[in-house]
């Protein structure tokens, strides 16, 4: 499934699924067709567990099969489904319950471009829920706080089944789905001390989306191309096979002695091509359009304002 959080004015954000050219309201469609009501938000669906995920998948298949005979205008009037271009997309998890966990320098070429040694163990930091925004939302330029405002396209992982001391061989069984993150970073704040948190945590510096693609549709998270453009010019072009620590290794390492919970989000690091590693350096400025893309997931687009 390609799951999103959408809204239609003046309504509040709700859980949806992309089906063809439509966005299906899973909770309403489920209630109408089988008397059950799936949760109306992403975290609720994640918490509901694998049986609910399978039910949602079956609803999407049913709706997709019926779509050629549907009157989408009538569906929209009933609040069941909408043409994709009629809805606003939010971050798939509008307000994470906890900080997003980030990885630093998880691609060797990226570590080298920042003149750092390849790390012997994963480097973790976090980004607070207040940093999370969705596709097409503006990234606020922090005037007066930074002159080195940088981009980072990353594969995002959302945990579906919690656990502690998860073994690497079973780690991917704990994944709910995958998304795109842009780990926007204020480099001068990031590197003023050895602790990166402030430079990674400014409001609006964790764009996420446009969807979460469920794990059953991504055969291998280490087989995905990542790209990023600024104003249509390609800046990053990498591949998840080049991660130093794979998704499975990250989950196993993180969960060693530390419980991962459903809904936890992990941003797995960026390939080379960031602005701070260029000669001369390049940085984001107001008016720029940033598009971060991960193969099989989609394009996360944000203006800088």
Please tell me what each predicted stretch does:
Residues 1-122, 291:
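N-terminal non-catalytic cap/leader segment that marks the start of a structured domain
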Residues 13, 57, 68, 82, ...:
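Catalytic-pocket segment enriched in acidic/His residues
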Residues 102, 150-152, 261, 285-286:
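Residue-level recognition of short, solvent-exposed, well-ordered loop/turn junctions
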């Amino acid at each position: 499934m390609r799951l999103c959080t959408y809204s239609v004015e003046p309504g509040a954000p709700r859980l949806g699924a992309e089906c063809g050219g439509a966005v299906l309201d899973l909770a309403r469609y489920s209630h109408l067709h089988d008397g059950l009501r799936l949760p109306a938000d992403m975290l609720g669906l994640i918490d509901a567990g694998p049986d609910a995920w399978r039910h949602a998948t079956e609803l999407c298949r049913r709706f997709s099969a019926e779509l050629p005979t549907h009157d989408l205008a009538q569906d929209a009037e009933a609040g069941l489904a909408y043409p994709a271009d009629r809805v606003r997309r939010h971050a798939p998890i509008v307000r994470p319950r906890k900080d997003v966990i980030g990885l630093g320098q998880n691609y060797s070429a990226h570590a080298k471009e920042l003149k750092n040694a390849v790390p012997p163990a994963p480097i973790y930091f976090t980004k607070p829920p207040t940093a999370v925004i969705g596709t097409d939302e503006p990234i606020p330029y922090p005037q007066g706080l930074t002159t080195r405002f940088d981009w980072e396209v990353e594969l995002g992982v959302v945990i579906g089944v919690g656990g502690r001391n998860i073994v690497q061989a079973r780690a991917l069984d704990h994944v709910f789905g995958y998304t795109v993150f842009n780990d926007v970073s204020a480099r001068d704040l990031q590197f003023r001390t050895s602790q990166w948190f402030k430079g990674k945590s400014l409001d609006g510096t964790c764009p996420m989306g446009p969807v979460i693609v469920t794990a059953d549709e991504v055969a291998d998270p280490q087989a995905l191309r990542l790209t990023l453009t600024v104003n249509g010019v390609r800046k990053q072009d990498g591949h998840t096979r080049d991660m130093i620590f794979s998704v499975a290794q990250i989950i196993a390492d993180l969960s060693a002695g530390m419980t991962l919970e459903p809904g936890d989000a992990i941003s797995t690091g960026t390939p080379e091509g960031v602005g701070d590693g260029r000669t001369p350096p390049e940085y984001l400025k107001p008016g720029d359009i940033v598009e971060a893309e991960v193969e099989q997931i989609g394009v996360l687009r944000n203006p800088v304002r």
